Amino acid sequence: MVLLNESKVTKGLFSRYVRIQREGKYNMLMDAKQVMQLLGCDAVTYTDILNNYENYSKLYKKTVDNVATNIQVKIGNLLTSKTDVIGHQTNCKGIAGGLAGDVFKQHPECYEPYLQCCKINKPLGKTQLLKMNDGRVLANIFGQNEAGAATDYKMVLYALKDLKKQMDSLGLKSLSLPYGMGAGIGGGDWNEIFGLIEEVFGPTPIKVVLCKLEK
């Protein structure tokens, strides 16, 4: 298997490429720049995928066989998404910057319960569900302990599993997450985090929308 020595083609990235193909978003008329933008990768990584597609298909066979069609990327604002639940990654220190700051500014009724959860509980690796005034549910996904570039992949995985368990228990059928969750201020690798989202929600009937703001 001839792959680049320092390949950036992770399981999450390759599954995104396969999903684009299967959803019909990819066609030969698209230029490389458009495809790379959809994937969020550079030219070297994209070329690696093209040159070694069969090898990566074998390497990530289980992932390719189980690429979820219930996970979709859509252009739009997370805060206005019409799913049952909207989720975002949070820290355990009660510090709300970036998207979290926008969420709590628009839904101040959820801020104090978030602060109390940080003070009283040990929420790392868990998810707090809160009812918003508009009837939707907010999911505070505790994927990092500290504020800033502190995303912990293991805790993100645990928190996503906790979120799924709670959604199943409450009969909630759809979820919106920010495209790039935990990879902005949180400092994580989106390809890794995407792989975790797919691992938890891919095999389920829960509809997942990854909201990407149009540049």
Could you say what each language-model-derived stretch is?
Residues V64-K215:
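Macrodomain-like recognition of ADP-ribose-binding/processing modules
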Residues M1-V67:
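An anion-engaging/catalytic patch
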